[in-house]
From Swiss-Prot:
This protein is one of the early assembly proteins of the 50S ribosomal subunit, although it is not seen to bind rRNA by itself. It is important during the early stages of 50S assembly. One of its GO terms (cellular component) is cytosolic large ribosomal subunit. This is Large ribosomal subunit protein uL13. Keywords: Ribonucleoprotein, Ribosomal protein. InterPro entries: Ribosomal_uL13 (IPR005822), Ribosomal_uL13_bac-type (IPR005823), Ribosomal_uL13_sf (IPR036899). It comes from the Bacteria. The keyword Ribosomal protein applies. Part of the 50S ribosomal subunit. Pfam families: Ribosomal_L13. The keyword rRNA processing does not apply. Belongs to the universal ribosomal protein uL13 family. GO terms for biological process: negative regulation of translation; translation. It comes from Cupriavidus necator (strain ATCC 17699 / DSM 428 / KCTC 22496 / NCIMB 10442 / H16 / Stanier 337).
Length: 142
């Protein structure tokens, strides 16, 4: 018996919506990364993008445990000498709700062309509304 290998044109992708209200950042991110990659499917193939589309609503109401609200730091660099910027989780959630979740999920996906294709299937919205009703997403509880 041969091992099954999924073909890119044969992959069936579903749409799921997750309500992130009062959910912990890391727990949501790890499950989302798993589903974007397609590891929950029996036809998972490492070199083919078999994952589903994930819509996350209420990302502004995401939480972290302990003192990570003030202690967790995010860094970015402008490219110029001395151009490093630092911000906390709390400030990032106020200014860009959902970006912390996007960064967490992106860090859990493979690096390279396949990982970049996977992260494009993640849609994050700060509020409860999203423009993907036409895709009829199923509710996913984490």
């Amino acid at each position: 018996m041969k091992t099954f290998s999924a073909k890119p044109h044969e992959v069936k992708r579903d749409w799921y919506v997750i309500d992130a209200t009062d959910k912990v950042l890391g727990r949501v991110a790890s499950e989302v990364a798993r589903r974007l990659r397609g590891k929950h499917k029996p036809e998972f193939t490492p070199h083919v993008d078999t994952g589903d589309y994930i819509i996350i609503v209420n990302a502004a109401k995401l939480r972290v445990t302990g003192t990570k609200e003030t202690d967790k730091k995010y860094y970015r660099h402008s490219g110029y000498p001395g151009g490093i910027y630092e911000t906390t989780f709390g400030k990032m959630q106020q200014r860009f709700p959902g970006r912390a979740l996007e960064k967490a999920v992106k860090g859990m996906l493979p690096k390279g062309p396949l990982g970049y294709a996977m992260i494009k299937k993640l849609k994050v919205y700060a509020e409860a509304e999203h423009p993907h009703e036409a895709q009829q997403p199923k509710a996913l509880e984490i």
